[in-house]
Amino acid sequence: MTLRRTRAYGTSGLVLAVCIVFAWQNAAAAQNCDAAAAPGVNWQDCDKKLLILKGQDLSGANLIGVDFTSTDLRNSNLLAANFEKATLVRASLADSTAKGARFDKIEAYRTDFSRMDAQGAVFASAEVQRSNFQDANLTNVDFTKAELGRAQFHDADISGSRFSFANLARADFRGATFTAPIDFDRAFFFQTRIEGLDLSKSAGLSQWQLNMACGDAQTELPSGLTRPEDWPCSEP
């Protein structure tokens, strides 16, 4: 009996030791914050704020929870990178490629996404108030439940994108284009700038949304909806 117990304890101890080693290796890999920027790098939860990372290749990288506050990521390859819950406040991703990237639940106030190619990216539940998406390719992007107050979409391509349940208060879509229907189901349109926008093929729009938005005589609406007698906004 004593020998069996000793062997059992020895085996249990070995298993525990192996588990500890694997756990340590996984933790070390997750905290590889000193690794250079490279495709597939694992920077999860690392501090990368106030850095110049312009032109880097971070395709497929694990960037979950990274602090990129005020970091320069312009002209970078962010293809399929995972930025979930990352902090990108006042960072710049201008002119970067981010097709299929994950930006779920990021914190990105006043962030520069201008001219970014983000086809098929996900910004679900992201906080991107006052951010700049001017001239960006946002086709088939998911902005479901995103906070987009005062965001700028001048001349952006938003074809096929989804803004359902998003907060678009004072967001500016003037000059935006789309060749495939976009979904505005129950999005908050308080003083959203839609002057000159052809929304005739958009989906999910209701009269109550238009009544609080800012359009003009050139704004085209889906069938069954009408222009308010007076749009709320009269100044640019």
Predicted regions and their residues:
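Exposed boundary/loop context
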Residues: 3-6, 23, 33, 38
